[in-house]
Amino acid sequence: MPMYILHAKDRPGVLQRRLSFYAAHRAFLEEQDEAGPVRVIMSGPLQTDDGETMTGSLLLLEAPDRAAVDRFVAEDPFTHEKIWGEVSISRFHRRPRPRKDTPER
């Protein structure tokens, strides 16, 4: 199944709103991961360089197609509550990295 990277930057001045809707956003991700069709492989907040402030979100998603990802984004509480500003979605091809302890063939 195709994979997608979702990179979302928060709008300026929304940190307190982000914090108030963070639990709803997390619940949405868990619900979607269980119900499908979009599976959340990895997710987490983007942060300032000092690690003190959340500034956006990064998600690695598995989905049947781009349309499913677009619906996923449209339904996320961070979209409804206008927390995310700029959102980019890119299809991603995972290339396994060989482990150092694996003998070459």
Map each language-model feature to its residues.
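Conserved, structured core segments of small domains
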Residues: 1-105
